[in-house]
């Protein structure tokens, strides 16, 4: 099916399949966030495991991430419609991970611009089949048909979006959590949407560079932010104090992995010993920490 025909089909299907609105919290005037479950995707949560939401201007609405399934995206769209009749003009994806963008197709009928980091389309194309297979395993029949909708507007450095009396600054970052991380800053309220550049309570996941993430964290710390919306955790967190636990975890991994390599520990020995003092401080630690150590070991093994 061609892209144009697929979009037309989705646009016609969406109203018929609209469900209940996702619950959202207004964390600042015109800024609404749905708090994702601190879990892995399952049939019970439908992939609603990330913080997603929308910002309302005087002219239109920008959606920031759309959730981990078409069903979640539809619920978010219904939440928008429950609060405003203004059109959705932008759907912004903060990075490639499926819990943040598999709901994009729910908004195709609104004919928005889909916006993401310049490297997002290639990353999504490379992982599409894997993501959809994983969704089918997790949700079973509830996964249904979840078409992937890539961005049609890319951010190389920064981009300003005007919602009507309300400007959003989008910024593309160097490799950190992933190699396509994007933040969204609402100038009116000083609210910074970080995507997965910030995990709170749930263990950070390294799919880019631990060293790069620490460098980006230093740059983020200096931004004039009133409140922050992390990709996972409470819907808003104090700034910049919320960065501290994640920064400690990443720095610990880098320091201890570097020491393990210096002492000629194998990868498995590093996985079995690095960062274990962090257990008990993070949700899903046992699931993701070994992967993180593996990623950092690979990153540092041949560093100069």
Predicted region positions:
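Hydrophobic h-region of N-terminal signal peptides that target proteins for export
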Residues: 7-19
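Metallo-beta-lactamase
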Residues: 21-27, 122-173, 178, 187-188, ...
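Conserved beta-strand hairpin/beta-sheet module of binuclear metal-dependent hydrolase folds
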Residues: 29-79, 182-194
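Divalent metal-coordination and catalytic microenvironments
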Residues: 30, 55, 65, 80, ...
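Active-site neighborhood of phospho(di)ester-bond hydrolases with catalytic His/Asp-centered motifs
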Residues: 64-66, 89-96, 115-118, 173, ...
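Active-site HxH/HxHxD metal-binding segment of metal-dependent hydrolases
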Residues: 74, 78-154, 158-160
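Divalent-metal (often Zn2+) His-rich catalytic cores of metallo-beta-lactamase-fold enzymes
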Residues: 214-265
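C-terminal regulatory/interaction regions
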Residues: 262-304
